[in-house]
Amino acid sequence: MPELPEVETSRRGIEPHLVGATILHAHIRNGRLRWPVSDEIYRLSDTPVLSVQRRAKYLLLELPDGWIIIHLGMSGSLRILPEALPAEKHDHVDLVMSNGKILRYTDPRRFGAWLWTKELEGHNVLAHLGPEPLSGEFNGEYLQQKCAKKKTAIKPWLMDNKLVVGVGNIYASESLFAAGIHPDRLASSLSTEECDLLARVIKAVLLRSIEQGGTTLKDFLQSDGKPGYFAQELQVYGRKGEPCRVCGTPIVATKHAQRATFYCRHCQK
């Protein structure tokens, strides 16, 4: 599933082609996504794009009369293409732009979403989200307050959007490795110093992934059709049985809440 770096990479890639241009019309080939494509999107015509923003894993296209909320789901990607390029099997939504470009949404598993809202505030998919991990609000003090009485393992807690948004399976595993924290540790067992380190490491890992265009493991592509290159820098995720790049101990894979977790027994305590 695309996580924060992949969604931010998509935002940065599509923004220059959308802001200041006008949506001539939307071409919906298959509106049966996780939730049906909103009727308002079908009716778009001669609508300027004012901004392209991100909240958590949602892309937000600001229009004069409302917002398009896009979620990439498990396998979605957005590309900027020449208008004449033929669609393929899993290309479900096109926004045809006045500058001769198309914003094309591709999603083999159709678990993403294209929604419409007049106002972002209070929308059900955005209403109960925690802070952005790259914001000043997310720091060691905040993390310690939220972990202090939490009797659950730190790995699934990091992936809870009520704690912090956008830290999914890949980046939770990578951040815990970088901080030297075992994923099975109770959140409440983390010291002040560990919380401070973990908050800083999460920011660093996410920023590095954004610099590399995100992580492509299967379906994710940047807006220009290229893969994300952070996969080449993964320390533990997807490396079961391979030697730790730091100490040589084989990487272990377990499951938390049906999600694969990767860690080094020697480096993470």
UniProtKB/Swiss-Prot annotation:
GO biological process: base-excision repair
Residues bound to DNA: H90, R109, K150
Record keywords: DNA damage, DNA repair, DNA-binding, Glycosidase, Hydrolase, Lyase, Metal-binding, Multifunctional enzyme, Zinc, Zinc-finger
EC number assigned by the record: 3.2.2.23, 4.2.99.18
Catalytic residues (positions): P2 (schiff-base intermediate with dna), E3 (proton donor), K57 (proton donor), R259 (proton donor)
Catalyses which reaction(s): Hydrolysis of DNA containing ring-opened 7-methylguanine residues, releasing 2,6-diamino-4-hydroxy-5-(N-methyl)formamidopyrimidine; 2'-deoxyribonucleotide-(2'-deoxyribose 5'-phosphate)-2'-deoxyribonucleotide-DNA = a 3'-end 2'-deoxyribonucleotide-(2,3-dehydro-2,3-deoxyribose 5'-phosphate)-DNA + a 5'-end 5'-phospho-2'-deoxyribonucleoside-DNA + H(+)
GO MF terms, alphabetically ordered: 8-oxo-7,8-dihydroguanine DNA N-glycosylase activity; class I DNA-(apurinic or apyrimidinic site) endonuclease activity; damaged DNA binding; zinc ion binding
Superkingdom, natural source: Bacteria
Cofactor remark: Binds 1 zinc ion per subunit.
Keyword field contains Transmembrane helix: no
SMART domains found in the cross-reference section: Fapy_DNA_glyco (SM00898), H2TH (SM01232)
Zinc-finger ranges (FPG-type): 235-269
Presence of the UniProt keyword Repeat in the record: no
Required cofactor(s): Zn(2+)
Any single Pfam family the record assigns to this protein: Fapy_DNA_glyco
InterPro entries: DNA_glyclase/AP_lyase_DNA-bd, DNA_glyclase_Znf_dom_DNA_BS, Formamido-pyr_DNA_Glyclase, FPG_cat, MutM-like_N-ter, Ribosomal_uS13-like_H2TH, Znf_DNA_glyclase/AP_lyase, Znf_FPG/IleRS
HAMAP family: Fapy_DNA_glycosyl
Biological role: Involved in base excision repair of DNA damaged by oxidation or by mutagenic agents. Acts as a DNA glycosylase that recognizes and removes damaged bases. Has a preference for oxidized purines, such as 7,8-dihydro-8-oxoguanine (8-oxoG). Has AP (apurinic/apyrimidinic) lyase activity and introduces nicks in the DNA strand. Cleaves the DNA backbone by beta-delta elimination to generate a single-strand break at the site of the removed base with both 3'- and 5'-phosphates.
Protein family membership: Belongs to the FPG family.
Subunit structure: Monomer.
Name listed for the protein in its UniProt record: Formamidopyrimidine-DNA glycosylase
The organism of origin for this protein: Salmonella choleraesuis (strain SC-B67)
Lineage of the organism: Bacteria, Pseudomonadati, Pseudomonadota, Gammaproteobacteria, Enterobacterales
The encoding gene: mutM
